[in-house]
Amino acid sequence: MKSIKRIGLCISLLILIIFATSCGSNKITGDSKEEQIKKSFAKSLDKYPTENLEEFYDKEGYRDGEFEKDDKGTWLIRSEMKIQLKGENLESRGAVIEINRNTRTAKGNYIVREVVEDSDGMTHNHTKRYPVKMENNKMIPLKSIDDEKVKKEIEEFKFFVQYGNFKELENYKEDEVSYNPEVPIYSAQYQLKNSDYNVEQLRKRYNIPTQKAPKLLLKGSGNLKGSSVGYKNIEFTFVENKEENIYFTDSVYFNPSEDK
């Protein structure tokens, strides 16, 4: 009888130990995953700022099996401001450029887009692309442009990676950090103030028709340690509702080159 009681006691203790260890380990794993997400973003954001885009010719990105051995890779950089006021169409202006490390050339487009909704509620994209190249850290149109406003915008355009700065990221107070391992996708959201450096820089360069301070949303997919097929996007959302939308998006990718 005593032996049975001892066995029963041992089993009970073992169950308690397993339960306690399991609960503790889930908490540690959760905290660890949150830190991994922050570190993953911090690693990609350390490229901000890179004032001279030509430095990307010599910058190495994350490489995996998608790259051929002799492919140095291509950086894809995109920045875009989108504004939709109440009762108006969504308008966006921005640029995308591919910096090929093999050929040491950079080409892309300055893009002006308007999303129009017709009487049937169908949306239509009216998009104009102006081919550009980069020389001496400046965007130069590859074709003549009659629109003086667009011509000036291209001359003055800077990608966010050229002036954005995330050195204070660790001091930001996050609203939410999420992770879905099945996809996998992950994100971190922060409420910013208008006094934040990046917000001031955006207001300096764009006519942002609201005084609301934005939320910063960092979105990523793929392996947290890095992936050439995943993405990491930055979004500053000033206004987001059914009638109005004001937000800025930015991304810097490192991909296998198409010329390989």
UniProtKB/Swiss-Prot annotation:
GO CC entries: plasma membrane
Position of the signal peptide: 1-22
Lipidated positions per record (N-palmitoyl cysteine): C23
Lipid-conjugated positions (S-diacylglycerol cysteine): C23
InterPro entries linked: Csa, Csa_sf
Sorted UniProt keywords: Cell membrane, Lipoprotein, Membrane, Palmitate, Signal
Membrane topology label: Lipid-anchor
Subcellular location, principal: membrane
Gene3D superfamilies (alphabetical): 2.50.20.40
Membrane-traversing stretches: none
Pfam families recorded: DUF576
The keyword Metal-binding is assigned to this record: no
Family classification: Belongs to the staphylococcal tandem lipoprotein family.
Protein name: Uncharacterized lipoprotein SA0404
Source taxon at top rank: Bacteria
Keyword Cell membrane annotated: yes
Compartments where found: Cell membrane
